[in-house]
Amino acid sequence: METATLVAISISRLLVSFTGYALYTAFGQPSEQLRDPFEEHED
């Protein structure tokens, strides 16, 4: 394979894995530990 193809595949895999980790953090098990500032604020 050419170098440009390997670089493009590597960058794509990095972006996909980062997106997957962000979704897991937002909606997976760790999301229970996140605080919600809108629920904490009382009018």
From Swiss-Prot:
Its main location: plastid. It is a single-pass membrane protein. Keywords: Chloroplast, Membrane, Plastid, Thylakoid, Transmembrane, Transmembrane helix. It is found in: Plastid, Chloroplast thylakoid membrane. Coiled coil: none annotated. The chain crosses the membrane at residues 5-27. GO terms for cellular component: chloroplast thylakoid membrane. InterPro entries: PSII_PsbN. It comes from the Eukaryota. One of its GO terms (biological process) is photosynthesis. The keyword Transport does not apply. Belongs to the PsbN family. May play a role in photosystem I and II biogenesis. This is Protein PsbN.
